[in-house]
Amino acid sequence: MPSVEVLRFEPLLEGVLQRRWKRFLSEVELAGGELVTAHCANTGPMTGVLHPGGRVRVRHDPSPKRKLAYTWEQAEMPGDGGWVGVNTALPNRLLRATIEAGLLEPWLGPIAGVRAEVTYGRERRSRIDLLLQPAPEADDQRPIYVEIKNTTWSAADLALFPDTVTERGQKHLEELMHVLPDARAVLIPCVSRSDVKRFAPGDSADPRYGELFRQAIDAGVEVVPCQFSFAADAVRFEGVLPVQRTESG
């Protein structure tokens, strides 16, 4: 599948990452030498993508409603790794645009409607990222529950999620299994880098997540890793990666 642009925006500003602190904050030196504090939406360890002294891109939004006028959006990887999307608020928007453009129809079937943040789960205390309504011509008319995970960690050509223990992520897998068989359950790792060729669970970071990942696949949860490439003014859908059941192969 040729790459397809799914999102375009005002060009981001380039700078050099000085440090990240208090999880939510990063300090960036812009091209003109100005030091700014940028919001960091990714509260995890950012394994493999946190490189002080490396080039980053930030979005400038001086709205008076915002505490910080800058948001850290992308990080350049050493060597030929390209750019990685680090803003965890972006994947849901990316996947919605990709689905509504019909780019995932070979995996999901034709879709008539998309709803976001719908309450579901065993105790009705969880929210699914996207709930899809199949189009009338779809062979399978069951609703489709979609859980999206931003994936930035890699080892060689393997994209990995998670990069730390995530009890929340474990719960999401259990909730996806719970909707079966009355609905379809789909896990979409949003692979926010273009230098990898496969996806696997990060067993070394969270062994329990890896166990649940394999249980979910065996129970009927579908895994559709969607790969994206990042430019200063756009994001492109690069296709769906094959799934590897374990980190070690």
UniProtKB/Swiss-Prot annotation:
One Pfam assignment: SfsA_N
Protein name stated in the entry: Sugar fermentation stimulation protein homolog
Family note: Belongs to the SfsA family.
UniProt xrefs under HAMAP family: SfsA (MF_00095)
Record-level Gene Ontology MF annotations: DNA binding
CDD domains assigned: SfsA-like_bacterial (cd22359)
